[in-house]
Amino acid sequence: MIPQAEYLQRAHVLRSAMAARNLDALLCYGSKRGQVRYISGYHPNYIANAAMVVLPKQCDAIMRIRFPFDLERARESSWIPDIAASGNTLNLASDAAAYLVEHQLAHGTIGLVTGDIVVDEMPRGLFQSLADMLPDVTWSEAGDVLQGMRLVKTASELDALRSSAQLADLGAEAAQEAVRPGVTEFEVVACAEAAMRRAGAEGYLVVISSKGERELIGPPESKSLEKGDNVIIEIAVQREGYWTQVARVFSVGQPTRALRRLYDQTYRAFRLALTDARPGRTCSELARSIGASLENAGLADAIEQDFGHGIGLDLPESPRIEHKDHTVIQEGMVLVIHPAVRKIGVGGVFIGGTALVQANQAELIHEIPDSL
């Protein structure tokens, strides 16, 4: 649980950043992603729900949500004193505009936070409505302010992440127990999801593949597992708002010697990455280190996707562990590191998990076996 004092500290830091940028207020909009929750403590949490927070440099903040039936939960979740329901998305804009006019901010510079590295959640029509209602406002993109704050996690955030990781491991264990001939991919995923939900999962995402060399991960299918299948499962789970992610490999029956070797080579690159993910290095350097380990094992042509990303209130978050991301790794960052390879004639291996960057290396907070 994130204490109220921490939300108040976030607001203080945001106001300092606003002053440095000559912003008169910050307007934050969101529905599914974590920007509103990071500031307010409230997550809209429903498919068509949304919320808007206005945080002035000096006056009290307000929050407007779309659905009236969620008002009680919003007020219980948030430190913001003035919370009301607007009824529809357009009214979110008109309520925010009225507040800015009332507080003599309709001629100021307003910072916009409407998404992250994955998606901008504010519909174009909603922004146009705001712009029409506030023709004298200067709008300034301010998403990077929040992104920078969210890179390094606090002690209470790390506690939530460790709790989330326990659920992810619970789901992986349930999946492993379910993997046997005749069981479908749907059934394996259902076992993982049920175990996590029973233990308090707020949200989850489970993908699976028993195709090995042909497909690394994908949505579950009605395909029944057969002896010799190479099963890859990736589990992400949210608890107390915070996501963790783990990727595991299972074999239906005894794995082949070649698949064991592929697992060992990928696991070696993964453990090396945990050692190399230390303060002062960049994400691009970490990506090169993982890539070099796999290439030295003769797997240059087998490498799949990037090597990981940040995680927290959102899945994924900044930064990305790839060659073009030069973000400097800092103590307190949380990274999902997941090298993946797919080799025709052998199978696929996807190993990874959530790790906390400490003074000298990253600490893995999942249980991942060192052999297949």
How should each PLM-predicted stretch be described?
Residues 1-372:
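Active-site neighborhoods and metal-handling regions in enzymes and metal-associated proteins
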